[in-house]
């Protein structure tokens, strides 16, 4: 394998773009803290961090395999390794299988409940790339997939999925729909041309209102989580800071343009970090 091929594999796995990894990792780590009522055992942190990174790359590979014909028509994606011919579909499938096995080995160190949930997580990871063909809001499926680690974190530590896990899961789904709609704005014109469905296409000229609506719902659910878990004022301070980030982002993505939308999307990882820090503060 030469240097060019290694670079192509690196690009296929999206390791040069860590922001989506953080968007998955922060809610998962927050769930570990909530489930542990404090800092979790280091083994859980290692297993779930590896799992997030590996499954994010698996999702990217599946997405590129599914979209290889569509990506040729989109300026932002027509240089990807599969689309440009740097790697074959066979190469991608073998890498995907190998990484999935790595993730499965990690989950074998957890309890049976979590192992069973991992199959649901894999199903969602496979479903998302294909639902863009028939489902009007694929961002909902992405929200289910990206944040499923919340359920797995609670099941691994508590062997159950309590009410607070469901509240937090719903909050992160709303958050994901909002930030991925911003991301989809960058490709909306191309998606309209080639028939790909997205929330950015569905919401049309009301898209900014819907992004703000889902931002609001995520904040509301976080407040409900704080009340249910009897969190102190520091948690609500974090919610206020998140709301300010959402307002700041609004003035960025409303300008449209690929750069503005991608920057607004990327800034969302700070939301995840803030909530994680506020959760940790509750137990120190």
UniProtKB/Swiss-Prot annotation:
Decide whether keyword Cell inner membrane is in the record.
yes
- Keywords of this protein's UniProt record, alphabetized? Cell inner membrane, Cell membrane, Magnesium, Membrane, Transferase, Transmembrane, Transmembrane helix, Ubiquinone biosynthesis
Q: Which Gene3D superfamilies match?
A: UbiA prenyltransferase
> Which E.C. number(s) belong to this protein?
2.5.1.39
Main enzyme class: transferase
Q: Which pathway does the database say it acts in?
A: Cofactor biosynthesis; ubiquinone biosynthesis
Q: Which reaction does it catalyse?
A: all-trans-octaprenyl diphosphate + 4-hydroxybenzoate = 4-hydroxy-3-(all-trans-octaprenyl)benzoate + diphosphate
**S-S pairs:** none
**What Gene Ontology molecular-function terms does this entry list?**
4-hydroxybenzoate polyprenyltransferase activity
Tell me the membrane topology, using the record's own terms. Answer: Multi-pass membrane protein
Q: Where in the cell is it found?
A: Cell inner membrane
Q: Which cofactor does it need?
A: Mg(2+)
The record's InterPro entries line, in alphabetical order, gives:
HB_polyprenyltransferase-like, Prenyltransferase, UbiA_prenyltransferase, UbiA_prenylTrfase_CS, UbiA_sf
What would be one Pfam family of this protein? UbiA
Under the cellular component aspect of Gene Ontology, which terms does the record hold?
plasma membrane
Top-level division of the source organism's lineage = Bacteria
Q: Name one GO biological process term.
A: ubiquinone biosynthetic process
Q: State which residue ranges cross the membrane.
A: 19-39, 42-62, 85-105, 107-127, 134-154, 165-185, 211-231, 233-253, 261-281
Family assignment? Belongs to the UbiA prenyltransferase family.
Q: What does this protein do?
A: Catalyzes the prenylation of para-hydroxybenzoate (PHB) with an all-trans polyprenyl group. Mediates the second step in the final reaction sequence of ubiquinone-8 (UQ-8) biosynthesis, which is the condensation of the polyisoprenoid side chain with PHB, generating the first membrane-bound Q intermediate 3-octaprenyl-4-hydroxybenzoate.
Question: Which protein is depicted?
Answer: 4-hydroxybenzoate octaprenyltransferase
């Amino acid at each position: 394998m030469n240097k060019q091929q290694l670079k192509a594999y690196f690009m296929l796995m999206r390791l040069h773009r860590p922001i989506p990894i953080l968007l998955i990792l922060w809610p998962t780590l927050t769930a570990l803290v909530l489930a542990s009522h404090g800092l979790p055992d280091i083994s859980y942190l290692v297993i779930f961090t590896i799992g997030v990174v590996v499954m994010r790359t698996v999702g990217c590979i599946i997405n590129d395999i599914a979209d290889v014909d569509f990506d040729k028509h989109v300026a932002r994606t027509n240089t990807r390794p599969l689309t440009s011919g740097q790697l074959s579909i066979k190469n991608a499938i073998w890498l995907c299988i190998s990484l999935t096995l790595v993730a499965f080995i990690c989950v074998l160190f957890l309890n049976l409940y979590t192992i069973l949930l991992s199959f649901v997580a894999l199903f969602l990871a496979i479903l998302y790339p294909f639902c863009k063909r028939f489902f009007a809001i694929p961002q909902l499926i992405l929200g289910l997939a990206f944040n499923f680690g919340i359920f797995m974190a609670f099941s691994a530590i508590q062997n159950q999925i309590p009410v607070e896990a469901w509240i937090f899961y719903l909050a992160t789904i709303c958050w994901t729909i909002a930030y991925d709609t911003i991301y989809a704005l960058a490709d909306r014109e191309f998606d309209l041309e080639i028939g790909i469905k997205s929330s950015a296409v569905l919401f049309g000229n009301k898209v900014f209102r819907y992004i703000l609506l889902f931002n609001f719902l995520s904040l509301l659910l976080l407040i409900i989580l704080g009340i249910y878990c009897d969190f102190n004022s520091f948690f609500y301070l974090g919610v206020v800071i998140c709301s300010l980030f959402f307002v700041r982002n609004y003035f960025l993505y409303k300008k449209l343009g690929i750069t503005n939308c991608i920057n607004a999307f990327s800034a969302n990882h700070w939301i995840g970090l803030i909530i994680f820090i506020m959760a940790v503060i509750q137990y120190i």
